[in-house]
Amino acid sequence: MNRQRPVALVTGGRRGIGLGIARALAAKGFDLAITDVENDETVIHELRGMGGKVAFFRGDLAAVETHAATVAAVLKEFGSIDCLVNNAGMGSVERGDFLGLKPENFDTIMGVNLRGTVFFTQAVVKAMLAATEVRFPRSIITISSVSSVMTSPERLDYCISKAGLTAFVQGLALRLAEARIGVFEVRPGIIRTDMTAKVAERYDTLIDGGLVPMKRWGEVGDVGAIVAGLAGGNFIFATGSVINADGGLSIAKL
């Protein structure tokens, strides 16, 4: 297969931050493999209109047993994977006091955010390392959250899942450094998406009060621009780095 463009695989690329990332990568010249639990033909059509090849692959991140087949389908369609963006994830099943946290809810979020991401990455890395030809810079970019280091007691399970990703990224960066695959973590802060729309009024007040030093919401395009920059290959020597996409939210203050 004669490839003229690099290929990025974006999990959860159908909406929200994932869609913002997909748009930015398409604008950067990437072909796109989008995975999600549901398809949205309008989104796929929009991304194809940006000039590259785009294909959708249905997949549930929690279903680890399906990961190898999903990666194989992507390879059959595109020939290789140059960039993996681990974006898919979920919030707490129920917010509330830690004393009321249910084991089944804890297992659900870990199954998607941590276990699912770790083993999907494993499947992609095996394919990357097996590639006989490397034509473009390669990277694995994991979208975690400022919640990996800034805790919220009412959604402690979510914070734990993101903190686990932080540890994973560091170990993965060491494992893949010699293969010259850049590994990065991007931590979004308060980002305007359909998931945050239900608490927009609360966040508006907090942002106006100075919680975010830039005093504005983050947009999905802010995260997308960071990911596209990392995927381009110019920051390979900074492997293992963490980028806070939060307008200064996580800066330690007196």
What feature does the model see in each segment?
Residues 95, 210, 228, 239-254:
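Short C-terminal tail/terminal secondary-structure segment
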Residues 14-15:
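Conserved glycine-rich cofactor-binding loop
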Residues 126, 174-175, 236:
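Alpha-helical segment proximal to the catalytic Tyr-Lys
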Residues 121, 161, 169:
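Active-site helix of classical SDR
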Residues 95-98, 102-107, 208:
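Substrate-binding pocket helix/loop in short-chain dehydrogenase/reductase
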Residues 177-182, 238-240:
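Short, small/polar-rich loop/turn modules that mediate ligand/substrate recognition or access, typified
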Residues 145:
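Residue(s) in the substrate-gating loop at a strand-loop-helix junction
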